[in-house]
């Protein structure tokens, strides 16, 4: 948890870290995978170790929550809140979340508890940090579900889209055609195309 990600080059170079960048006030100008973007106050962006990030301008207050998959034991968690979940593999573009007042208050509460937990030196600290991280991820996952309009009965359909992007990350060097990914998912290319259209991807 840091409010000075831009001032620590080692964090920027670490390719094992998942990140949430949360602009709490003002703006933050970033370059994500060679695309410049300006985040506004209140926005939260989840990023994977594959993203290349450069902070171009800080004009406010922001917080970066960083973790690696070993800390979170991520692959043992439910798919939707894992590193292969909706936040990190929900679509081809960077997910920008805009929490409402209630969710913003929840994120502030979680961030405050995370900061407080870092100050405690005991054997329970690591587990408490994991629990708080999961709360942060679940809160952001709910925001992403609303953004992608994933209705309660439609999770399975959207899960196919998520699995597609996980496979693309794994096999993009050797597999270039949608048909190849459709085969891996045991679906037809037309089914995938219809799902992408349904979710505006």
What spans do the regions from the language model cover?
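Short beta-strand His + acidic residue motifs that chelate non-heme Fe in jelly-roll/DSBH
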Residues: 29-31, 47, 52-58
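Conserved metal-binding segment of the jelly-roll/cupin
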Residues: 39-52, 66-69
């Amino acid at each position: 948890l840091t409010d000075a990600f831009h001032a620590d080059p080692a964090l920027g170079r670490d390719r094992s870290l998942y990140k949430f960048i949360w602009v709490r006030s003002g703006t933050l100008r970033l370059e994500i995978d060679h695309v410049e973007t300006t985040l506004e106050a209140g926005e939260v962006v989840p990023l994977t170790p594959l993203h290349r990030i450069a902070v171009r301008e800080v004009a406010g207050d922001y917080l970066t929550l960083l973790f690696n998959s070993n800390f979170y034991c991520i692959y043992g968690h439910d798919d939707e809140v894992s590193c292969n979940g909706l936040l990190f593999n929900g679509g081809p573009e960077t997910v920008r979340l805009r929490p409402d007042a209630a969710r913003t208050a929840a994120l502030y509460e979680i961030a405050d508890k995370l900061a407080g937990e870092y100050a405690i030196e005991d054997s329970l600290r690591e587990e408490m940090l994991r629990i708080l991280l999961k709360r942060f991820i679940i809160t952001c996952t709910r925001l992403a579900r609303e953004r992608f309009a994933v209705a309660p009965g439609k999770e399975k359909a959207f899960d196919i889209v998520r699995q597609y992007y996980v496979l693309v990350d794994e096999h993009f060097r050797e597999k270039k055609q949608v048909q190849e990914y459709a085969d891996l998912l045991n679906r037809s290319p037309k089914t995938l195309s219809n799902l992408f259209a349904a979710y505006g991807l």
